[in-house]
Amino acid sequence: MASVEEIRNAQRAKGPATILAIGTATPDHCVYQSDYADYYFKVTKSEHMTELKKKFNRICDKSMIKKRYIHLTEEMLEEHPNIGAYMAPSLNIRQEIITAEVPKLGKEAALKALKEWGQPKSKITHLVFCTTSGVEMPGADYKLANLLGLETSVRRVMLYHQGCYAGGTVLRTAKDLAENNAGARVLVVCSEITVVTFRGPSEDALDSLVGQALFGDGSAAVIVGSDPNVSIERPLFQLVSAAQTFIPNSAGAIAGNLREVGLTFHLWPNVPTLISENIEKCLSQAFDPLGISNWNSLFWIAHPGGPAILDAVEAKLNLEKKKLEATRHVLSEYGNMSSACVLFILDEMRKKSLKGEKATTGEGLDWGVLFGFGPGLTIETVVLHSVPMVTN
């Protein structure tokens, strides 16, 4: 009879969790930041608020965003005007839209990741699904498993209402699953739709207005597994370590409250300072074991909470401008898609490395860091190791 220790050892994988494929998707409806103030004040029937519109236009101009993809259309707002009001009861219709559309958008990204991976979907053993909104039972994980036709035995983890740091959370979770279950292949999906947070403007809620200028919709999927079969699987990044911490006395710095009016968004003005003053401690804890203290020697996947956060981190760590190029590119092209952002940036990083004929998936560098920032104020830190670039 095998001992508990023998059984335990047999269950463990031998090598580190590795990202084996990435897929991304967005809604079809695209809005451009240059004229978004006109669009937003029109669809929310707020054109009489001329001074607030000027202020919102300045926020949009400073956002460093070129365009975003948003599921909510003008026609939908005409049909459901309470969504476009500032504080009107509207949770029921928001929920109806979200619970249907979040799994569908997640499916689009998942199918792209599965196609790149190239293996039968029956080999997916675990599913980790993350979204900020649309809580119900059974959840979006169950719906996605059915939409994709995954095995009924797939082991599911559903993460709701984590917020912008959760792109790091899902990778940390997938790492633990892959490394503690030999042969596991974990499908990770982040699907974010801003229907729950969209609302009209108010003079008394400028933090809400900032959110309306920054957030976009998108979904991203990755497949994670240990001990890849390199004859049929192509490793992209290894997940070396993963940690989470929260900054003391900052519980309200980034907050969301779900009420009958939807999810209201609250932001302290000093969030960029809070993050930038605490990020080096996270870096040191993660990289001291590797003997790394030069932050410019890393490739960077940082959640693009907004240009002010990126600027503050860049200045505090004396980062070269090119270090956050992939992050700024995703912010410009898609806005802040909450948990999905860092996975979009991972995708951009490996594509950019291929196009630039770099030696590794991390822009030619070996080591990298992935950061998620969000409510709590919570910071997720994932240490990445790139792999040699393979061209077909």
Swiss-Prot record:
SUPFAM superfamilies: Thiolase-like. This is Stilbene synthase 5. Mediates resistance to pathogens which are sensitive to stilbenes. Homodimer. It comes from Vitis vinifera. GO terms for biological process: biosynthetic process; defense response. Pathway: Phytoalexin biosynthesis; 3,4',5-trihydroxystilbene biosynthesis; 3,4',5-trihydroxystilbene from trans-4-coumarate: step 2/2. It catalyses: 4-coumaroyl-CoA + 3 malonyl-CoA + 3 H(+) = trans-resveratrol + 4 CO2 + 4 CoA. It comes from the Eukaryota. Belongs to the thiolase-like superfamily. Chalcone/stilbene synthases family. The lineage of its organism: Eukaryota, Viridiplantae, Streptophyta, Embryophyta, Tracheophyta.
